[in-house]
């Protein structure tokens, strides 16, 4: 008599419990990994932001080397190119010669860009170099502001001193600051700082900045303790002065002081083109 042995087959695959345990472990690992990835990405954006600011500082240094002075903060009503900002003056030193030449041609047509903004094509020309990657606003030109076909923005503002009335900083109306005139020391004097454009998009214009009372304050320039005349919806903020602090693009009062959207606060360029 032959006895046949029955071979039992072993089950292949996961049980439901094993599958749930594996999913749980993967979820825990992802939960630990994602914040680290996000932190690494934000650190990269912050570093990129600092690199852009260093380029601006280097452009200022090259301009000073060529002209013997720093670029004017902005041009007033008596200038041939009214409301021209320190950024537009630096365009040839930022590898933006074509944009600069276009600006010169448009100023020949209309010496005051606010008389006919549609003529000045640079108003709506977005330059990625001028926008910190951490910012959530300003990357698209505004096309719905009354009287302006298109307006582009900057995260980086020149420091005009304590506030727009004192003109004791590096950049201000028709300024011709020389390095030798910076008495507090080049490494101790901040020249450029950060402030993201506001969501109402009335401040932070890089091409031509009227700002407060035609001083370009809050557009391409701002003081470290800026005052407020209550223009463009800022009347709720009071007269100030406004110093460094946390901000948000949707808060109207955040347009009145330096701040940033990346960890560690706003970054600065000193007058020796050093990034801090």
Residues of each region from the PLM?
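Surface-exposed loop/linker segments characteristic of extracytoplasmic
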Residues: 2, 28, 32, 43-276
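N-terminal single-pass transmembrane signal-anchor helix
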Residues: 11-45, 55
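N-terminal secretory signal peptides that target proteins for export/translocation
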Residues: 1-9
